[in-house]
Every structure is written in structure tokens, then in C-alpha cells.
């Protein structure tokens, strides 16, 4: 078997191609999830085969298997290692059809693998972006979403692949799945860290990836279905259910509005990764600053408290793509008072825009005991421990 590491690709090439090394343990996970649905007549396809980690695992399963690969060196290694398996040297998002892979209309067809994925609009921070060339009906901002749409176009009976968890748990991303979400239902899923991939271990922050098993289904799935779905966590007894996690969605503004007032602001925040990585309180940033006023000050002080102190000991990656965490304790006047006091004593910009007298007029005499704040923080940090 080929040692499946992308040693011939630069980091830029890895990003452009969406190429990552899939560890055997992750391939085994996919195999265990889909194995019960493979029959002697099943045909198995691996799109974006890399060096053949999934081909190796599934080569003796079902009736036959095939792979596809765009990268020249990977393709040549695949055809050398697997001369009896059809390997297509192609961009699999062009001219998508069952005929191309010798699939009849009624063939039992299962897709497995770790297809390329990357946001083609924001891959490179210095302006260079990936190029996605594909059939018009599978166009997406993300390679991975285009592959999911391609699997739907191929009418796969089951799909068991690795992809970013954000495709499912971020509502906008989920809606972008198009016909895939209308024709497939999630049956089983296990979350793991992107740092399980050798080629991106050195990235600054990891993000949640999911091994997901989907079944072709006339009803499909809704975002509410995903919110109530119980995800497994790799190497953990804990479970993840989106509906059980309190976030700021629908409560606190995350993106700037037009005609934002200048003055005290909070830097725009997409998710927990953005909150922890970017600035907190800022001033006079009309394009990327959220207006802070007397009514929402305690909410942004809470987010600033999170930013400064949130350090879970395990499974940190699960939080990354979630909207910033919220707590109903913010509705309690005493808890609110302590959050304001913490911000006043730790953030210079708060002291610049708010005097002690004004804050005490709004929230009462400020407390200096923060134990309750850190107890609530500890509860949130331990959600997935």
C-alpha cells in the first residue's frame, strides 16, 4: 500500500487542491459506519482518491470499486499500485454522470472518501484564490459542497465521507447544500479535529470535521433535524447536539449594520474561532465594528470575558465553528453587574467610554467578586470533556 502523505505538494497546492492525508484510523471509522450497507452487488466510488487510503480499504468490498484523482503524481501512483481498479484522471465535478463510471441506473452505488474541500472565496489571505471549474448545477463557494451536489447528481444510495462539520451546523452553509439536503438524510456521524490530518497539523487553529453517513431519502433533512441530531465525538463518550448549546444567535448582533455609529464598538464575530482570534472592543471601525450602547453593553462584555478566559482543556476544536456561547445568567442583574465590573476593571476602552458613575447608574454598585463568572465559564468549557 502507498504511504498516503502529500509529500510532493506545497502547502499552497494542498490548499488549492483541498488535499489532506487521511489517517488509517479515520478510514477505518468510515468503513465501520458504512460496512453494514455494502452488499455483494454494491459498487463503491472514491472521488479525489489521493494516494489510495480508501481504495486500499474498500478494494475487496462489494462488486467493484473505482477512484478518481486530479493530481498527476497521485494518479500515476494509484494506477501503479492498483492496476486492476478503474482510476479516472479527471476533475470529477465536470460532466457528472453515472455513464462515465460504467454505472447502470439501478446499480447499488455507495460513495466513500475524503473529497477536497475549501472555501474558494477565502483560501488565500493575500488575494490568491482557488479556482473551481465544475458543472453549472453543482456550483458552490466550497469544493466540498460541490462534491456533495455531485453525489446527489449521481444518485448514490449512500454517502459516507469526511467533511467540515460547518456544512451542517451553520445554517447558511446547510442551506447551500441545495438538492443534497433535499434528497439525503444523515444517519450516523462522528466529529473529530482537523488536526487528525497530517498535512494541516501545523495550522493555527483546528476546526471540527465529521465522518458522516447519509442515506438517499425522499424526505431529505431540515436544519431542525440537524439541530436535534446526536453526533458522536471521536475517542470520547460525550455527544454533541446543537440544540442543547446556547449561543448568541438571535440575541446579539454578529455583523455590522449599515450606518453604524462610530465610537465604542465590538469587532465583528462570525463564530468562536473568530471571537478568540480577532480583536474584541474597538473604536471607530464603521466597516467591521458592531455598535455598542447602553442596552447591549453587558452582552459584549460577556463576549469579551469569553475571549479573555475561554480555555477548555479538551475537545477545543468542537467550539470553533459554533456561534459564540451565551448564558441565560446574563438575564440576572447580579451576574450582569459582575460582567460589567470585570470589563471595567480589565478593558481600557470601557473606562474610556464609561465612567464608574455612569455604569453604577445603569447597573448598581459594581461588584468585585468574579467567582460566579468563572464558575459559569467552567461549566461551558466542560461541555465536551
What do the PLM-derived regions correspond to, one by one?
Residues 1-79, 85-86, 91-96, 350-385:
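Class I S-adenosyl-L-methionine
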Residues 55, 118-122, 167-172, 221-222:
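Short catalytic/ligand-binding loop motif for oxyanion handling, primarily in non-cytosolic enzymes
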Residues 91, 111-118:
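Amphipathic alpha-helical repeat scaffolds
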Residues 94-107:
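Short amphipathic alpha-helix with an adjacent loop that forms part of the alpha/beta core around
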Residues 118-140:
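Mobile active-site "lid"/loop adjacent to the S-adenosyl-L-methionine
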Residues 139-197, 212:
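Conserved Class I SAM-dependent methyltransferase catalytic core
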Residues 204-260:
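Flexible, glycine-/basic-rich loop-and-beta segments that form/coincide
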Residues 265-385:
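C-terminal target-recognition/interaction regions appended to catalytic cores
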Amino acid at each position: 500500500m502507498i504511504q498516503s502523505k502529500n509529500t510532493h505538494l506545497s502547502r499552497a497546492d494542498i490548499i488549492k487542491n483541498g488535499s489532506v492525508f487521511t489517517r488509517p484510523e479515520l478510514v477505518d471509522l468510515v468503513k465501520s459506519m458504512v460496512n453494514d450497507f455494502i452488499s455483494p452487488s454494491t459498487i463503491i466510488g472514491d472521488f479525489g482518491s489521493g494516494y489510495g487510503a480508501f481504495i486500499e480499504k474498500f478494494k475487496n468490498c462489494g462488486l467493484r470499486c473505482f477512484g478518481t484523482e486530479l493530481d498527476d503524481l497521485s494518479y500515476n501512483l494509484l494506477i501503479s499500485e492498483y492496476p486492476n481498479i478503474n482510476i479516472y484522471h479527471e476533475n470529477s465535478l465536470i460532466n457528472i454522470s453515472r455513464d462515465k463510471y460504467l454505472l447502470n441506473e439501478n446499480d447499488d452505488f455507495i460513495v466513500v472518501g475524503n473529497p477536497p474541500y475549501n472555501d474558494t472565496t477565502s483560501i488565500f489571505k493575500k488575494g490568491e484564490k482557488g479556482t473551481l471549474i465544475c458543472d453549472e448545477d453543482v456550483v458552490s463557494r466550497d469544493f466540498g459542497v460541490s462534491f456533495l451536489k455531485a453525489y446527489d447528481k449521481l444518485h448514490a444510495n449512500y454517502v459516507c465521507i469526511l467533511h467540515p462539520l460547518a456544512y451542517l451546523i451553520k445554517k447558511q452553509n446547510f442551506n447551500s447544500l441545495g438538492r443534497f439536503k433535499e434528497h439525503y438524510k444523515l444517519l450516523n456521524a462522528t466529529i473529530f479535529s482537523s488536526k487528525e490530518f497530517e498535512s494541516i497539523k501545523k495550522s493555527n487553529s483546528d476546526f471540527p470535521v465529521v465522518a458522516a453517513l447519509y442515506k438517499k431519502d425522499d424526505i431529505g433533512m431540515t436544519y431542525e433535524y440537524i439541530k436535534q441530531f446526536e453526533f458522536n465525538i471521536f475517542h470520547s463518550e460525550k455527544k454533541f447536539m446543537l440544540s442543547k448549546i446556547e449561543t448568541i444567535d438571535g440575541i446579539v448582533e454578529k455583523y455590522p449594520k449599515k450606518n453604524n455609529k462610530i465610537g465604542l464598538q465590538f469587532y465583528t464575530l462570525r463564530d468562536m474561532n473568530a471571537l478568540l482570534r480577532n480583536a474584541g472592543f474597538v473604536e471607530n471601525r464603521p466597516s467591521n465594528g458592531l455598535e455598542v450602547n447602553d442596552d447591549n453593553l453587558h452582552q459584549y462584555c460577556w463576549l469579551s470575558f469569553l475571549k479573555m478566559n475561554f480555555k477548555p482543556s479538551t475537545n477545543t476544536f468542537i467550539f470553533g465553528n459554533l456561534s459564540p456561547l451565551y448564558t441565560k445568567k446574563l438575564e440576572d442583574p447580579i451576574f450582569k453587574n459582575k460582567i460589567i465590573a470585570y470589563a471595567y476593571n480589565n478593558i481600557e476602552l470601557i473606562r474610556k467610554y464609561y465612567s464608574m458613575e455612569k455604569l453604577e447608574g445603569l447597573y448598581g454598585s459594581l461588584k468585585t467578586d468574579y467567582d460566579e463568572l468563572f464558575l459559569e465559564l467552567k461549566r461551558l468549557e466542560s461541555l465536551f470533556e
